[in-house]
């Protein structure tokens, strides 16, 4: 079953362009390693607060990608996360889509 991984974080306004570039590099790297990533959407909540929502075809693929980030197997992750603060993530199973 499909799942969503959502991370809420803060970025200084002066770092926004660089954060987006680094995030795009991370999305490309993750998609290359884990093709079950089907969507990656970035939304701005306020001047500093962002929500990044990634849709996965399976929890197993999502978990493997999260583990790859934790172990340093995805080199683009470190630079992407370096510009963020107060990150909090959660995962949820999709139960209905229309």
Label each PLM-derived region with a short phrase:
Residues 1-72, 81-98:
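Short S/T/G/P-rich N-terminal loop/turn motif that feeds into the first structured element of a domain
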């Amino acid at each position: 079953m499909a799942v969503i991984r959502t991370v809420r974080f803060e970025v200084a306004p002066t770092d926004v362009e660089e954060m987006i570039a680094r995030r795009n590099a991370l999305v490309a790297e993750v998609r290359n390693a884990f093709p079950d990533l089907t969507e990656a959407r970035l939304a701005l909540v306020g001047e500093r607060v962002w929500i990044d929502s990634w849709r996965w075809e399976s929890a197993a693929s999502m978990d493997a990608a999260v583990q790859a980030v934790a172990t340093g197997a995805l080199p683009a992750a470190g630079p992407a996360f370096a510009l963020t603060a107060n990150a909090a993530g959660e995962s949820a199973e999709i139960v209905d889509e229309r």
